[in-house]
UniProtKB/Swiss-Prot annotation:
pH-activity relationship: Optimum pH is 8.5.
Protein name, entry field: Methylthioalkylmalate synthase 1, chloroplastic
SUPFAM superfamilies to which the protein is assigned, alphabetical: Aldolase (SSF51569)
Keywords of the record: Chloroplast, Phosphoprotein, Plastid, Transferase, Transit peptide
Gene Ontology terms describing biological process: carboxylic acid metabolic process; glucosinolate biosynthetic process; response to insect; response to water deprivation
Chain positions found as Phosphoserine: S98
Regions that span the bilayer: none
Gene expressing this chain: MAM1
Residue ranges of every copy of the Pyruvate carboxyltransferase domain listed in the record: 85-359
Species of provenance: Arabidopsis thaliana (Mouse-ear cress)
Length: 506
């Protein structure tokens, strides 16, 4: 499966050394300057930020290694400190439930390996009770990724799988996960009135009895790390949640999840729910509280952060936010929000995600699922570090922090100072001058004015001006033919989706 991806080594600067990383990028085969031949499904994924690639990188290692730091001892129901937030990735279970996003067994294994490079604390890799093939795939991940201990850091991911409150599901989950060093089962049931009435057709007491029986059965098989999930917790009665969670804790669970399964909660509402449960559930201080938010109202990231602010210390996310209906909370959004603002506005909370692996992971998931992100998707979209407005371009040229709050290098992208500038009708003279300088042209004011005038005329007919266009403007500025330029070395404006251009040595 890896053969379907283009991998190019890029140099990532770190303190005191150079680390070589893998960038997984889709390109158009027509981009001869890159000397690439593989055709990709969606050329709009082209990212401008990866515009500076070391010539020496091609002969170097292609695996990004995180900063060497010993991983904290793993105790299922305890955290190394009160500010640590465990990242529970469910791309391979909840994410795969995206319509049209199914994965083959080899693809699931490859993504699991990449999630380990990303350093997720827990990866939920599927539903063993759904089919024999799924069980065998999960077993393979448990035997391989679930046993690959990093010798330098001691890191090994927790391998988790989901089960309904049915003994056959729980038995299948044990059969799949028992080979992992750190197996975890997530037993779940619905807790909202509407689900209990119409889906389960059970009373509150019957649901509690079913949950407790399932937890005890999981323990009897050998699980000592058991997570209990409240499906549709966001619409559940608060006092019933306190009661069923209290009984689950008494039965021996290590983690409890409050699911906003239909994405109905507002951030303040969800935060208040977590606060209430932490204050009123017997034994809640002896387990880790997890948040699981869906994105039906576009609030999954905000709700997840609200839950963390209220004291939750496990956040459940997917790569690119894929998942049922409108998707789940996005790993890259939640993690980068905590990295960017956690120390300042959320009492110092943090994760141990190796954020330099985010872009490579995002690209892999997009390619394997066929679920491509829109250009303006936060963190990983093609336009995240791209600027066309002249005012913004001028600021970026002076100091990137004027209009960028995140560093592209932090998510595994290497950019030159000007590589995020897209030249179009909103671009100013300064940006054009700087791009020409990058191309090797030092123009006096008179010549620059002539070129810029032609540039402005050209933008009336083309949405994006290419480097080839700029060169033609310079060399033929006295007798340039706009008609000729419109067909020169670039796509015409009809149907053209503006995406950044990369100039790299691969």
């Amino acid at each position: 499966m890896a053969s379907s991806l283009l991998t190019s080594s890029v140099m990532i600067p770190t303190t005191g050394s150079t680390v070589v990383g893998r960038s997984v990028l889709p390109f158009q085969s027509s981009l001869h300057s890159l000397r690439l031949t593989h055709s990709y499904k969606n050329p709009a994924l082209f990212i401008s930020c990866c515009s500076s690639v070391s010539k020496n990188a091609a002969t170097s290692s292609t695996d990004l290694k995180p900063v060497v730091e010993r991983w904290p001892e793993y105790i299922p129901n305890k955290l190394p400190d009160g500010n640590y937030v465990r990242v529970f990735d469910t791309t391979l279970r909840d994410g795969e439930q995206s319509p049209g996003g199914s994965l083959t067994p080899p693809q699931k294994l490859e993504i699991a390996r990449q999630l380990a490079k990303l350093r997720v604390d827990i990866m939920e890799v599927g539903f063993p009770g759904s089919s024999e093939e799924e069980l065998e795939t999960i077993k393979t991940i448990a035997k391989t990724v679930g046993n690959e201990v990093d010798e330098e850091t001691g890191y090994v991911p927790v391998i988790c799988a989901i089960a309904r409150c049915k003994h056959r599901d729980i038995e299948a989950t044990w059969e799949a996960l028992k080979y992992a060093k750190r197996p975890r089962i997530l037993v779940f049931t619905s807790t909202s009135d509407i689900h209990m009435k119409y889906k389960l057709k059970k009373t509150q007491e019957e649901v509690i009895e079913m949950a407790v029986s399932s937890i005890r059965f999981a323990k009897s098989l050998g699980f000592n790390d058991i997570q209990f999930g409240c499906e549709d917790g966001g619409r559940s009665d608060k006092d019933f949640l306190c009661k069923i969670l209290g009984e689950a804790i008494k039965a021996g669970v290590t983690v409890v999840t409050i699911g906003d399964t239909v994405g109905i909660n507002m951030p303040h509402e969800y935060g208040e729910l977590v606060t209430y449960l932490k204050a009123n559930t017997p034994g809640i201080d002896d387990v880790v509280v997890a948040v699981h938010c869906h994105n039906d109202l576009g609030l999954a990231t905000a709700n997840s952060i609200a839950g963390i602010r209220a004291g939750a210390r496990q956040v459940e996310v997917t790569i690119n936010g894929i998942g049922e209906r409108s998707g789940n909370a996005s790993l890259e959004e939640v993690v980068m929000a905590l990295k960017c603002r956690g120390a300042y506005v959320i009492n110092g909370v943090y994760t141990k995600i190796d954020t330099r692996q985010i872009m490579a992971t995002s690209k892999m998931v997009q390619e394997y699922t066929g679920l491509y992100v829109q250009a303006h998707k936060p963190i990983v979209g093609a336009n995240c570090f791209v600027h066309e407005s002249g005012i913004h371009q001028d600021g970026i040229l002076k100091n990137r922090s004027t209009y960028e709050i995140l560093s592209p290098e932090d998510i595994g992208i290497v950019k030159s100072q000007n590589s995020g500038l897209v030249l179009g009708k909103l671009s100013g003279r300064h940006a054009v001058k700087d791009r020409l300088k990058e191309l090797g042209y030092e123009l006096d004011d008179e010549k620059l004015n002539a070129v810029f005038s032609l540039f402005r005329d050209l933008t009336k007919n083309k949405k994006r001006i290419t480097d080839a266009d700029l060169k033609a403007l310079v060399t033929s500025s006295d007798e340039i033919s706009l008609e000729k330029l419109n067909g020169a070395n670039g796509l015409k404006s009809n149907g053209y989706i503006p995406v950044p251009q990369v100039s790299s040595n691969v």
